[in-house]
Amino acid sequence: MEQRREPVYLGIDINDRYAMISYYQLNMSEPETVSTIAGSEVFQIPTLLAKRKGMGQWYYGDDAKKMAKTSEVICVDSLLKRAVNGDTVRVEEESYEAWELLALFLKKVMDLPTKLGNVPVCDRLILSVERLSKENMEVFWKIAPKLGLSQEQFMVIDHKES
């Protein structure tokens, strides 16, 4: 007989400097916040992407921050602000919509609990931002399908609600 899996809820608190991800299942007493380094208590993930020059390889968070100290990558910061402003970002010869880069960052952050072996796939994502606005909601609704989420699986709240 197949064992029923508890749904997995991911929560990402994001601003222009950092993101933090937690997950929760109904069989847990409280959510667990995930570190990018197993066993570490450092939970803040820099909201940053870095693309290796001449390649399609993207780094995020602390890896992007470390790689930024070399000349091997081109960094993109302020992902949330750029996406809300509707910016286009030029990286080498390629132009990217900032919301697409924010979606890439969020996808990489969402994969973190699974990579660390903590949880299977996400059933529902809750994003928490400092303040909700029409502009950031438009960006997030555009991003949801890129993350493989339907409107029923995706929610955005502000810090007052969280």
Where do the PLM segments sit?
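Phosphate/oxyanion-binding active-site loops and adjacent basic polyanion-contact surfaces
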Residues: 75, 95-106, 136
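Short, low-complexity, polybasic intrinsically disordered segments
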Residues: 134-149, 154
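Phosphate/ATP-binding catalytic cores across multiple sugar-kinase/actin-like superfamilies
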Residues: 101-117, 162
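Gly/Ser/Thr-rich loops at beta-strand to alpha-helix junctions
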Residues: 16-18, 129-137
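Early-domain small/polar-rich strand-loop-helix modules and first-structured segments
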Residues: 1-88, 153-162
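Short glycine-rich phosphate-binding loop at a beta-alpha junction
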Residues: 118-131
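Surface-exposed acidic, glycine-flexible loop patches that form ligand/cofactor-binding
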Residues: 1-3, 115-120
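Short hinge/gating elements
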Residues: 63-64, 84-96, 122-125
